[in-house]
Regions:
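N-terminal accessory segment detector
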Residues: 2-30, 39-202, 207-217, 258-290
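Generic structural hydrophobic/aromatic packing signal, biased to beta-strands
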Residues: 177, 201-203, 226, 240, ...
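Short Gly/Ser/Thr- and Asp/Glu-enriched loop/turn motifs at secondary-structure junctions
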Residues: 196, 243-248
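Structured beta-strand/turn binding interfaces of compact recognition modules in eukaryotic regulators
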Residues: 206, 241, 254-256
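C-terminal edge-of-domain segments
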Residues: 247-257
Length: 290
């Protein structure tokens, strides 16, 4: 009777197979929805992390803007913290310079994370005013030293003696840790004294040079003091070769920098088209004078 009853049920009546099929369909649908929600949450987390913790280029291509155009960046908390730290240290020297020149004005001090890259560059420009090339470089050295704990240079020398490994290691960590300052870069192979090693860093379009537009700021506030700091304080030679035609730069760890008088940058003229304080009539940037 039971078998007969099952056989005579209308075809539209939900049988056991129908229930099984519907149950499986519902489970698959729920699973797909859960996966979609998880993917959306993951994408949202990645977006939040990229916007808050790490900065990135905001250009559609993901690469620095073409020469003549200013690259757009999305700076996160990590980047703004470094901008604030450096800017506040340099503001002390900018205030001293303004006081000596009798042009000091009352300016409200910005809070943490209120600094952006433009304000960081602006402070650098104020430090440069009223100082010679050597004085500008000395300010940067003092700023860098003030950010290190006591005995840090000596510890660095012990951890990173001037070897191929130390040069390659520092090149590798330069790429992620200095993105906020110079923009995207990559480790490249270089040759030092006939030995090939991956201790070079190619900066695609230096953010500092792009925003300052000043040869003097590039050389006096970045290139020379950074070379000097690594070579003389840390004991790890470093040479930086900026390219003022495309705003790229090459950092070579393990290579001793030449004396300033023998460095090609010593005779570099102003970027008259973009520098606000350029002297087009001079054969080289006036800020490069001692």
């Amino acid at each position: 009777m039971v078998l007969l009853s099952i056989q005579t049920l209308p075809s539209s009546y939900p049988t056991l197979n129908n229930y099984t099929f519907n149950y499986r369909s519902q489970r698959q649908s729920q699973s797909q929805n859960q996966n979609q929600n998880q993917n959306q949450n993951q994408r949202r987390c990645v977006k939040i992390r990229s916007n808050v913790i790490r900065c990135g280029i905001a250009e559609p291509s993901g690469e620095p803007a073409p020469l003549g155009q200013k690259t757009k960046y999305n700076d996160g908390l990590f980047e703004k913290a470094f901008m604030t730290l450096f800017a506040r240290k340099m503001e002390n020297f900018a205030a001293k310079s303004a006081s000596k020149n009798g042009s000091q004005k009352e300016e409200k001090k910005k809070g943490w994370f209120e600094y952006d890259y433009d304000s960081f560059v602006d402070v650098s420009r104020k430090v440069m005013q009223g100082r010679s090339r050597l004085q500008q470089q000395q300010v940067v050295r003092e700023v860098l030293m003030s950010m290190l704990p006591p005995g840090a240079p000596a510890q660095f020398r012990k951890l990173f003696p001037p070897t191929k490994w130390a040069a390659e290691f520092n090149a590798a960590i330069t790429v992620p840790f200095f993105f906020w300052l110079v923009g995207p870069s990559e480790v490249v192979e270089v040759e030092i004294d006939g030995v090939k090693q991956k201790s070079g860093v190619h900066i695609k379009k230096c953010r500092y040079l792009e925003n300052s537009g000043c040869v003097g700021m590039c050389v006096n506030m970045c290139k020379i003091p950074t070379q000097d700091f690594f070579t003389n304080e840390f004991g790890l030679p470093l040479t930086m070769n900026p390219n003022f035609e495309d705003m790229s730069c090459e950092m070579v760890y393990g290579q001793v920098p030449p004396p300033f008088e023998e460095d090609p940058v010593a005779k570099q003229p102003c970027l008259a088209d973009i520098c606000t304080i350029a002297n087009p009539s001079s054969s080289f940037c006036p800020k490069l004078q001692a």
